[in-house]
Amino acid sequence: MRRLNLFPLAGILFSVLVLNVAAVDAAAQSGDFEIAQHGQAVGSASFQFAATKDGYDSTSLVKVAMQELDYALSKNEELGAANQLKHVMLSATVNGEAVSVVAAPDSAQFLLNISANGKSSTTRLAPHPGAVFLPDFDAGALETLLALAVTQNNRDLWAILPKGAGSIEPVQLATYPDQEGTLDGKAVTVHHLVATIAGANTELFSGPENQLLQAELPQEGFALVRKGFVLSPAAKPIAPTGDSGAVPAAPAN
């Protein structure tokens, strides 16, 4: 059973509050999202989690099609029973450029093997049990962060960012008053948080089971919205911080 609470190729993406939540069957856990910029649909994102004997397998898909950005991503992860990252394989294209990343813990390090621009490199990062692998527009990564927040009691959370040579950054979460919304036409209470990663803020809205419903991303005007969800009133943009560039960047080698 996977317990959910509460969040970049470019680095999108906690005074904390531990929420009491019901256990959710990971085998049935999935989500479909619209990617929008200034309210206009520009792509889609989806994820699915399946229970295994040792934890969970997760799959994420992302597609963005804009005049200045053609972005596609496929990510497969193996997670432990407490949502620890065991292995990840990512394949992506950014404006026609192919990128692949394979990552896994290795002894006292976490290794990122990156292939981009026709070159390969390996980056060694400090390992953290509360780390999540966070590519751009990846709703599944945000869902995993919500689960990790419960596992870690909202403490010692980290984001592995597959940007440049790759890095790992602390995650801070601030809680705000609950809001209201509808999911598939039914009224729901919406939990509201702001995650800060590498100096950039992302607003997170989660449902009664703390499943991801919406994320307002640091890139100007971009949002992930679960299909069938409507926030009332609509989210107001938070003050921009950090790198708010709109286009994901392939790792530089």
Predicted regions: what they are:
Residues 8-20:
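Bacterial N-terminal signal peptides
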Residues 24-107, 111-116, 144-253:
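Acidic, serine/threonine-rich low-complexity disordered tracts
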Residues 114-140:
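Acidic/charged, solvent-exposed loop-and-adjacent secondary-structure segments enriched in E/D, K/R, S/T
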Residues 1-6:
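Positively charged n-region of N-terminal signal peptides that target proteins for export
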Residues 10, 141-143:
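N-terminal compositionally biased or targeting/leader segments
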